[in-house]
Structure formats: structure tokens, C-alpha cells
Amino acid sequence: EKHNIRLYGFHGTSHKYVSEKAIEYLGKQNSKIITIHLGNGCSMTAIKNGKSIDHTLGFSPVNGLIMGTRSGDIDQSIIFHLAKKFNYSLDEINSLLQNKSGMLGLTGFSDLRDIQAEAEKGNKDCKLALQMNAYRIKKYIGSYAAIMNGLDAIVFTAGIGENSPDMRQRVCEDLDYLGIILDINKNQVRPDKLTVVSTDASKVKVLVIPTNEELEIIKDKLSARSIENLVKNDKEKE
């Protein structure tokens, strides 16, 4: 509190938009949902009863999932190791974690399409990076399912989440113990609207929902303006 350090979270408008769409589809407010925003920046949110209760990003947009150029979760002692043993400055370490890590650091590419293309050609670094990316997402799915004591749906959104059937399949593989069963045929889509890509037998719905952050921002502004008008009218009545 003294230094104004807190958990901020990021991609909030995206998570809010798709979670509300998911709740509307499920038809119940008291739901347990994990929203997975996968783009060049990536984040996940655990949403219980319509409220965010945990998020992979915090004070900065660096931690959590492996991203295009950002590291995601690391052992914090690496920072001190780089500074003490290799004389990295704080600015150099910050640049390394923000701009030269993640998929770029693992493969030399920051664009998932390039990484997938290289993996298909047999590039071992790219194959490993795709496995690592899915593994990290799975860890958070398991963690969030535990803290919410169950799961009703997981939602994929943003550039990669909406447009990469391969990444969705990698993430959902071997999660049947949680009740997550992906339909391989349904998953071969890049939808322009809410689409269910899980099987009928899947207890947990797997949804792909195109995000619309601009619309969510407009809705928030209109809501804020309505509240201001209500307050103004109440004051005028006084």
C-alpha cells in the first residue's frame, strides 16, 4: 500500500465481455467459468458467480502464461542472478522479460502462425514451445477449477484463442477428468459468433467467443454516464 503496488490485472474488458456472453449462454448467473484470452498478450481469469476471483496477470502484464515476447511465470531469483553474475541492469532485465522472452525467446518467432508452421517442418524448438504453452494453460485450468470447486465452461477468445484449433486442442487434451471433452470436428472453426466446440457428453462446455473490447468499453461508458445522470437528477431534486 505504501508504494501503491497492487494486483491490477489486464484484458479486463475482453474477459468481461466473453464471460457475460458465456453466462447468458449457460443460462445461470451462479456459474464457474475460466476465460482464456490468447493473443500476443495472454491471460486467464477465474470467474465465479459473475465475479472475477483470480487472474494470471497482476502488477504488470509479464507474469502468468507464456506470451509472444513476455516471459510469463519465472523464478524471481533469475532476476538477481542476471544482475549479479552477468551485470545486467534493471532496464536490461525489464526489456528482456517484456520484449525478448516468451515464444520469441524460445523459438526466435513471436507469431504463433510462424511457430506452428516451423513445428510442422520439424523445428524442435517450436514443437517444445507449443507444448510448453499448452502445459502452462492447463496448469491454470486445474488451479482455477480447484479454487472454484468445479467448472461449468471454459472460453477461448482473442486472436489465437479464436483462430487456432490446434492450440485449443492442445489445451483440452487429457482434461476429461475435469469433464472437458473437445469435439475434434466442431473445433475446426474460426467462428464469428459464440460456438460450442465440446462434445455433447462433455460436462464442461468449451466455448469459442469472439471478443469485442470496443463494444464493452462503450457499454461501460454509457453505464457510467447513466449513473452520473442519476446522481445529477437526485441532487437537483434535493
State what each model feature region is.
Residues 127, 131-151, 161-230:
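Internal helix-turn-beta structural module
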Residues 48, 54-86, 95, 158-189:
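Catalytic phosphate/nucleotide-handling subdomain of diverse soluble enzymes
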Residues 86-129:
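A mobile "lid/hinge" subdomain adjacent to the ATP/sugar-phosphate binding pocket shared
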Residues 17-25, 78-82, 92-96, 143, ...:
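Alpha-helical scaffold segments in soluble metabolic enzymes
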Residues 1-83:
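Glycine-rich phosphate-binding loop of actin/hexokinase-like ATP-binding domains
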Residues 9, 13, 17, 42, ...:
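Conserved active-site and cofactor/substrate-binding residues in soluble primary-metabolism enzymes
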Residues 32-36, 91-99, 153-155:
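Beta-strand segments within the central parallel beta-sheet cores of soluble alpha/beta enzyme folds
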